[in-house]
Each structure stands twice: as structure tokens, then as C-alpha cells.
């Protein structure tokens, strides 16, 4: 794998290296081969330029009418079977939102279209339980490791109408505050200062973990 990655790396200092590891062609009827023919696909991408302004100014978030199925065997894992996310992104493209809150089929908040969610109520930070759906992103886990007071809960979409602040996180955007939250006919301005403060408090730990801010 290291040889494949080394051969694909361009002479650049910053970007996104995507590595997909597959089990190769399987048998009939979804059966896996006893000894899979593992393949590795590598691609290089630029970091989306919009992320820097998102981090500083915040984004507009709403909802989409696509839910995630509950499947505890896959919950938390980042895998290549992401058909639901394709439907979510298609629905998002028909809105004016930068991203959307995504629930499971029981209306529990899970994540955003390609990021994890955190929200602030009464001075306490919360994030969604991913026991039955969603992806436990590396940035989410980094935040939880360094902020042990964050509560992991099951939360219905209807119960977050009065949050004080909210942010999205993933490995590329890191931490992005939500500037406005639209739920149905209700649109609210959220505070971004608590998010910026949290992001700043994690900067030293982030450099220690990943070597760059």
C-alpha cells in the first residue's frame, strides 16, 4: 500500500490523498472469496478553497427529506457503500443551504451530509450517538478525545430548535460553525463565537496530533 501511495503522491505540500481499499471481485450472490484479491485505488485532490471562509464566517444549514437507515453492523464505519449520501447530496443541491442535518428513520439526529455535528445548549456541548447509523469521523473522535465533557446523546430533530450554537466537523474542514439554522419555517441566527473559541482551544492539540493547523 505504501508503494502505491508513494507513486501517486504529486510534488505538492498540501492536498487530500484519498485511499480506497477493496476486496476485489467477489463470488456470485454477494459471496466473498475465501482469499480476496485486494485492490488499492489512490487519488489526489485539492482542499476545497471554501473551507477557510466557512471556518471564519460560518455556514447556512437546514434539512433534507432523506434519512439514514439504521444498521448497527455498519454504524460508525467509513465504507464505500454510501448510496444514501448520494441521495442526500442530490437533495441538498436543490436547496440554498451549505449543508444539512441528516436524521435516521426514527428522526434522531445523526450527522451532516459529509460531516459530524455538535451543538451547544446552556453551556454544554453535545454530539449524536452513532450506535445505529452514521460515520465516526476522525475529527469527531479527535474532538471527543480532547473534550471529555461533550455528551453523546440521542436527540430528535424537533428538540434542537433552541440550540445556542452548532458546528460541523470532518478531517478536511476541521471545525465549521453554523451561522443560520433552518428547521421547517423557522430560521435562526446562531452564535459562532463559542465555536471559534472551542476551535482555538484545540489548536495546540491538533498540531501535536497531526503536525499542522
Where are these regions (language model features)?
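Ordered, amphipathic secondary-structure segments that act as subunit-interaction surfaces
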Residues: 12-21, 28
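Helix-start/capping segments and mature chain N-termini
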Residues: 3-7, 22, 27-213
Amino acid at each position: 500500500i505504501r508503494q502505491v501511495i508513494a507513486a501517486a503522491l504529486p510534488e505538492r505540500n498540501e492536498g487530500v490523498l484519498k485511499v480506497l481499499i477493496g476486496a476485489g471481485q467477489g463470488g456470485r450472490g454477494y459471496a466473498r472469496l475465501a482469499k480476496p484479491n485486494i485492490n488499492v485505488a489512490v487519488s489526489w485532490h485539492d482542499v476545497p478553497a471554501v473551507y477557510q471562509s466557512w471556518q471564519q464566517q460560518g455556514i447556512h444549514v437546514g434539512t433534507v427529506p432523506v434519512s439514514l437507515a439504521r444498521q448497527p453492523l455498519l454504524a460508525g464505519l467509513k465504507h464505500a457503500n454510501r448510496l444514501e449520501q448520494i441521495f442526500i447530496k442530490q437533495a441538498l443541491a436543490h436547496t440554498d443551504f451549505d449543508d444539512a442535518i441528516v436524521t435516521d428513520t426514527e428522526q434522531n439526529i445523526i450527522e451532516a451530509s459529509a460531516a459530524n455535528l455538535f451543538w451547544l445548549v446552556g453551556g454544554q456541548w453535545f454530539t449524536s450517538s452513532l450506535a445505529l447509523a452514521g460515520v465516526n469521523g476522525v475529527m469527531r473522535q479527535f474532538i471527543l478525545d480532547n473534550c471529555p465533557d461533550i455528551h453523546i446523546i440521542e436527540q430528535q430533530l424537533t428538540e434542537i430548535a433552541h440550540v445556542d450554537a452548532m458546528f460541523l466537523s470532518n478531517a478536511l474542514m476541521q471545525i465549521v460553525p453554523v451561522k443560520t439554522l433552518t428547521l421547517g419555517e423557522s430560521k435562526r441566527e446562531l452564535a459562532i463565537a463559542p465555536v471559534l473559541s472551542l476551535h482555538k482551544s484545540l489548536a495546540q492539540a491538533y498540531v501535536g496530533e497531526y503536525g499542522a493547523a
